[in-house]
């Protein structure tokens, strides 16, 4: 089993513990490969997964919300090519929003506007252009990894 398959297996195991009886599948809309947004069958839920540095991370929530999770190495010199001036925390937030939005990197990351939040229990809010906001949280992770979760309730 290659590393990608092993990470997928770990993420599915984590999700199965969170959502007993559910099954998970991914199918790329562009190439048909087993990657891309993970879909849930057998549970009224939505999920998001992310992988970095040998780790697999998973998040689950009610099906009615848009949910995105991203993990990034805390030092990533190549970020400047994708999101000029960004640090790993900024990138994880942007990527979580793009995952929650459902379009991923087909949207220019520069279109995501992130601001510190004032509501209690929320770390940040973000928008893609002038669209409805996503609520965001910075999540503790293992040493060397930053995690961010973005969610948006239905309109």
Predicted regions and their residues:
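Core catalytic alpha/beta fold that binds nucleotide/phospho-ligands
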Residues: 1-155
């Amino acid at each position: 089993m290659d590393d990608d398959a092993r990470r997928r297996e770990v993420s599915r195991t984590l999700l199965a513990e969170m959502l007993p009886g559910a099954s998970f599948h991914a199918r790329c809309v562009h190439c048909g490969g087993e990657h891309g947004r993970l879909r849930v069958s057998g549970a009224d839920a939505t999920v998001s997964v992310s992988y970095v540095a040998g780790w697999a991370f998973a998040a689950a929530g009610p099906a009615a919300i848009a949910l995105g999770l991203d993990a990034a190495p805390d030092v990533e010199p190549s970020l400047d090519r994708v999101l000029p001036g960004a640090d790993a925390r900024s990138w994880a937030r942007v990527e979580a929003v793009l995952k929650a939005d459902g379009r991923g990197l087909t949207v220019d990351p520069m279109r995501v506007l992130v601001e510190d939040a004032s509501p209690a229990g929320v770390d940040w809010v973000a928008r893609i252009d002038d669209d409805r906001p996503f609520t965001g949280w910075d999540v503790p992770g293992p040493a060397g990894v930053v995690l961010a979760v973005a969610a948006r309730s239905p309109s």
